[in-house]
Amino acid sequence: MKTSVFAAILGLALFAVLCSGSELQEKDLKETLLSAIMETALEAQPEERECRYLFGGCKTTSDCCKHLGCKFRDKYCAWDFTFSK
């Protein structure tokens, strides 16, 4: 009787160890897949550029913020003499 109880407890302990090991592997797999999906999603989104503020360096007028234009000679953003409403 003692032997069968000991064998049953040993079997349950072994089963618990195996289940926890497979659960850890499954959790690690989920984390790996989630991080791969997040990286792919971040790469797929276009990067938004911030506009250049007053006296910021620029190459074209589209680099500058609203109501600023790129001065061709010195290549900096300056007021383009427009007003907002």
Curated annotation (Swiss-Prot):
This is Kappa-theraphotoxin-Gr1a. It comes from the Eukaryota. Residues 53-55 are annotated as: Involved in active face. Belongs to the neurotoxin 10 (Hwtx-1) family. 09 (HaTx) subfamily. The keyword Secreted applies. Disulfide bonds join C51-C65, C58-C70, C64-C77. Residues 22-49 form a propeptide.
